[in-house]
Amino acid sequence: MKGIILAGGSGTRLYPITRGVSKQLLPVYDKPMIYYPLSVLMLAGIRDILVITAPEDNAAFQRLLGDGSDFGIRLQYAVQPSPDGLAQAFIIGEEFIGNGNVCLILGDNIFYGQSFTQTLKQAAAKTHGATVFGYRVKDPERFGVVEFDENFNALSIEEKPQQPKSDWAVTGLYFHDNRAVEFAKQLKPSARGELEISDLNRMYLEDGSLSVQILGRGFAWLDTGTQESLHEAASFVQTVQNIQNLHIACLEEIAWRNGWLTKKDVETRAKHLEKTAYGQYLLHLIGK
């Protein structure tokens, strides 16, 4: 299983903030936004990850994350020349994906909830078909919407329907078998000129291999596409961390708990950051 983070786009809804920096490099409380989707892939046990960016932002992501060795992972980078749809990520990443399965996550989505690691690993363990993650919303017409039966098999999937068949939005996290690459190549641009992820998932639906994993009560899915939602996400992270004294999306901690970094590795990393609360958290974590 390999992972792809799609961190392209121009972030126009956040102008003028994003005129000079990628949205996914903006801070969400105490970490760059890209840390949050990266942490999800790491929690799923995925170590080989491709970060797809806009051409002008690629170097900045590489400066921030390097080759991934600081976090016990292996990072590669690619560019999306123009924002031509989420499903294009599978075409861009074809060589990287190879013959295995793949998890795609959007670079501006934040997930938090109990037992999330177990949920992710269950989805990653599936060898056939695709899994989407549903989250109940009050305004489903703003999202891709999935309808499913009592066994969580998808019955329909639509992009921003005027009359939604359910109130379960499809989040920006998708697990696919290797057919995703060929399915993406068969797609034609939608009315808005993009290769739609909903159309790709519908191909799995049509052969009966699209399942739905529910993110239910007590779970948070945060979009960061507007100034208001970006502020709300930062406030959420701050509140949870202050109450629990545990960090959300601490990549070094996840790598250490996964056995990908040693205590010495974490200590070395922490000492570079010891003047920050983040660095102090890492030192406390390993008992220093």
Curated annotation (Swiss-Prot):
The keyword Transport does not apply. Its EC number is 2.7.7.24. GO terms for biological process: biosynthetic process. InterPro entries: G1P_thy_trans_s, NTP_transferase_dom, Nucleotide-diphossugar_trans. It catalyses: dTTP + alpha-D-glucose 1-phosphate + H(+) = dTDP-alpha-D-glucose + diphosphate. It comes from the Bacteria. The keyword Transferase applies. Keywords: Magnesium, Metal-binding, Nucleotidyltransferase, Transferase. Binds 1 Mg(2+) ion per subunit. GO terms for molecular function: glucose-1-phosphate thymidylyltransferase activity; metal ion binding. Its cofactor is Mg(2+). Mg(2+) binds at residues 108, 223. Homotetramer. Catalyzes the formation of dTDP-glucose, from dTTP and glucose 1-phosphate, as well as its pyrophosphorolysis. Belongs to the glucose-1-phosphate thymidylyltransferase family. This is Glucose-1-phosphate thymidylyltransferase. It comes from Neisseria gonorrhoeae.
